[in-house]
A protein has these predicted regions:
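Juxtamembrane interface at the cytosolic side of transmembrane helices
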Residues: 1, 184-241, 252, 428-456
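Alpha-helical transmembrane signal-anchor/signal-peptide segments
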Residues: 8-32, 251-275
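Repeated scaffold domains used in trafficking and secretory/extracellular systems
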Residues: 30-43, 76-91, 120-132, 271-286, ...
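Loop/turn residues immediately N-terminal
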Residues: 54-58, 64, 93, 99-103, ...
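Short loop/turn segments that connect beta-strands within beta-propeller blades
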Residues: 61-65, 106-110, 146-150, 305-308, ...
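Beta-propeller fold detector
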Residues: 66-74, 112-118, 151-166, 311-320, ...
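Hydrophobic alpha-helical segments
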Residues: 116-206
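Extended, hydrophilic extramembrane loops/domains of integral membrane proteins
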Residues: 134-172, 337, 383-417
Length: 456
């Protein structure tokens, strides 16, 4: 399963149009009360409300009594309608930013793709507006457009003031595990390792099983099987152990060893380039009170007077889960509402005061777990029931969710992620967190003992 799911994850574009109904998945994966990322945010449009999240866009009004599918024009596949943000511009132009592209709503209420000049391996992380300017943030660049929004200028954010170029140790290990650290060639090498591990697994089982079925056939096949199993295993032992160890480090408890680490970029890798913000940008928003831009990255928050200025790290760094921000809105003055899996907080930038949205107390330090009491996946201020945050697990109770939305499809790529990380095995309960740790040790044991047996 690791090998097959890994191959799918290494080539997401090949499988982006393949979905599976949640009907066939464990009940925890079914949507309930807009949970599991179904509702990330809302946007007022004319006299109605547009809801968006990881399964597209939906149309309703401030009462949310009737929910209508509003996804006409998006490419086939849930992966292609994972909406990061939605903006209604002056003049009623509406833009939706999916992970893989920007779309504009035409007069026939159909979403049309807009080419912003984004690289093939880049992903959109946010969309915002400042006056009549449209700003799209990818994970590596900022794209700026003015009316009629047909041409975008690419901005490379300058290196931060007085900060050395460092990259995430976690992301480096992750990309080494997938091969992405060295581009297409690296991914193909890892694909080969996946196929090798698949062969070693199957041949190992057959070597044990065949003699118990038909002794004659088993005896004839076993020498050849044993020979190739040993040859392939010996030649690729270093690579298979590397893939095993790096995967082992990407899940708890080993994850805690690397999750906050920073290292120099690996020479000649994809992160070793002139853009120090490669795969680090998450959002940029204009603060009308302080007259500057608030830049959020995987390294924290920075401020810039102009988008072309040198970013300055803010003196106060609000608590944000390592999974990143899901909510970033201004409320009054220079108050910012920031939501992530660490919780929902209000940050007044001028004073530096941060308070919990629900308890009005200061942020509490949590040891180990990146999850707070409230696992915030979204927020909406547009319904008559009042403003509310959306909990990833519990959802939102203030607006009803149509029953038929519970089994909306999940992309094959996302299922592969859940399978690859062990989260899909919900019958393990809390033990699923340790699944990779235990299985990883088991695989290492098999590789080590196989090497020992081969020497005899």
């Amino acid at each position: 399963m690791f090998c097959v799911s890994g191959l799918i994850l290494n080539h997401p574009s090949l499988f982006s149009k393949i979905d599976v109904s949640r009907r066939w998945l464990p009940s925890a994966y079914r949507y309930n009360n807009w949970n599991n990322g179904l509702l990330r945010g809302t946007e007022k449009w004319r006299a109605q409300v547009l809801l968006y999240g990881n399964n597209g866009v939906w149309l309703t009004d401030s009462t949310a009594k009737h929910i209508t599918d509003f996804n006409k024009g998006f490419p086939q596949g849930v992966d292609n309608r994972n909406i990061r943000g939605l903006i209604s511009m002056p003049g009623n132009a509406v833009f939706a930013a999916s992970t893989y592209g920007l779309y504009r709503l035409d007069p026939q209420l159909t979403w049309q793709y807009v080419d912003i000049g984004m690289a093939e391996n880049d992903k959109i992380s946010d969309i915002t507006t400042c006056g009549d300017s449209l700003i799209v943030t990818s994970r590596s660049y900022i794209f700026l457009a003015l009316p009629p929004y047909t041409s975008f200028k690419t901005l490379v954010v300058k290196p931060a003031y007085n900060e050395p170029h460092r990259v995430s140790l976690f992301r480096t290990v992750w990309w080494l595990h997938s091969g992405q650290l060295f581009g297409l060639l690296g991914r193909l090498v890892v694909d080969g390792v996946a196929l090798i591990l698949l062969f070693l697994s199957i041949s190992g089982v057959l070597y044990w099983f065949l003699p118990h079925i038909r002794k004659g056939a088993g005896k004839r096949l076993m020498p050849h099987l044993f020979l190739w199993h040993n040859k392939v295993g010996r030649l690729t032992l270093g690579l298979t152990i590397l893939i095993c160890v790096t995967g082992w480090l990407l899940r708890p408890p080993a994850l805690l060893l690397i999750v906050y680490g920073k290292i120099p970029p690996v020479p000649f890798s994809t992160v070793d380039n002139d853009n120090v913000w490669y795969d680090k940008l998450r959002s940029v928003r204009y603060d009308a009170t302080l007259n500057d831009w608030l830049l959020y990255t995987s390294d924290g928050f920075y401020s810039l007077r102009q988008l072309t200025d040198i970013p300055q790290r803010t003196a106060v760094q609000p608590p944000v889960s390592v999974m990143g921000l899901n909510v970033q809105q201004t409320t009054q003055g220079d108050f910012w509402l920031l939501g992530s899996f660490s919780g929902l907080y209000v940050w007044q930038r001028s004073s530096g005061i941060i308070s919990d949205y629900y308890t009005f107390q200061g942020p509490q330090k949590t040891e180990g777990s990146p999850l707070g009491t409230h696992i915030v996946a979204g927020y909406s201020p547009h319904f008559i029931g009042g403003k509310f945050g959306v909990d990833y697990n519990k959802g939102a109770l203030l607006i009803p969710m149509p029953r038929e939305m519970a089994i909306l499809p999940m992309s094959l790529r996302q299922i592969a992620i859940e399978l690859h990380t062990g989260r899909l095995y919900t019958f393990l309960g809390s033990g699923s967190v340790l699944y990779i740790f235990i299985i990883g040790l088991g695989i290492l044991w098999c590789l080590w003992t196989g090497k020992k047996i081969m020497k005899k």
